[in-house]
């Protein structure tokens, strides 16, 4: 089977979904077709197989058919916000919020989101993950099959990630330890080499002053 790539985006981000053509939704109710998002910032010719649009709430989307992978659904939610936007006393908060997104939300009990994903057949890490960069934070779900109910549940969880994440004191304290452990793991030769190169090549830019991993004291 072939599948459609669906990209849904907030004004500050993008969500990508890949589904079989038979499961690809029609243009959402109330949505408006738009020109390609980056048509004014690139000289590359737009792919006319991609359908772009915007929902009434500002969410942007793009849909494209493809042939691989077969009968799978790939979901990507990307916010155009990362460590470069942080103030001195906020370094690492974008990355920390990314971690908290998997803890719980207004409609998903604390600690239940990962278990919910596993019940849907996803493996945490391989099929469910997230990353924070200098200018973008991205979440991913790779669904094992193109089941409409599974797609609906995945989009529900992405909606929770976009606007309903909760920050209970206990969950924050617990995740702080996880992030600190990640900091220790990254203090290796490769990371130190890259940091030294960034400080040499870009001494006054966020590439050398706003590492996504953040600072322990923050």
Region annotations inferred by a language model:
Residues 1-2:
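Positively charged n-region of N-terminal signal peptides that target proteins for export
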Residues 5-18:
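Bacterial N-terminal signal peptides
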Residues 21-26:
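Boundary at the C-terminal end of the N-terminal hydrophobic targeting segment
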Residues 30-53, 139-142, 199-218:
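Histidine-acidic residue clusters that define the catalytic metal-binding segment
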Residues 36-78:
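Mature N-terminal segment immediately following signal peptide/propeptide cleavage
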Residues 69-70, 79-193, 209:
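Active-site-adjacent, His/Asp/Glu-enriched structural segments that form or flank metal-binding
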Residues 74, 194-198:
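Short glycine-rich loop/turn motifs
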């Amino acid at each position: 089977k072939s599948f459609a790539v669906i990209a849904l985006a907030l004004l500050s981000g993008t969500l990508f979904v890949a589904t079989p053509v038979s499961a690809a939704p029609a243009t959402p109710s109330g949505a408006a077709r738009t020109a390609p998002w980056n048509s004014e910032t690139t000289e590359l010719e737009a792919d006319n197989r991609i359908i772009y649009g915007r929902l009434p709430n500002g969410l942007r989307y793009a849909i494209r058919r493809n042939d691989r992978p077969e009968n799978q659904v790939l979901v990507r939610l990307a916010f155009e916000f990362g460590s470069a936007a942080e103030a001195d006393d906020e370094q690492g908060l974008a990355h920390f919020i990314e971690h908290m997104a998997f803890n719980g939300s207004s409609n998903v009990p604390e600690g239940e989101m990962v278990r919910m994903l596993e019940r849907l057949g996803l493996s945490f890490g391989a099929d469910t993950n997230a990353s924070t960069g200098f200018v973008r934070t991205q979440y991913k779900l790779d669904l094992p099959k193109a089941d409409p109910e599974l797609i609906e549940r995945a989009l529900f969880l992405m909606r929770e990630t976009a606007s309903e994440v909760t920050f209970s004191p206990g969950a924050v304290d617990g995740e702080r330890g996880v992030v600190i452990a990640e900091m220790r793991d990254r203090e290796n030769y490769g990371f130190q080499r890259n940091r030294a190169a960034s400080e040499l090549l870009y001494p006054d830019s966020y590439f050398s002053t706003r590492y996504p991993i953040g600072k322990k004291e923050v």
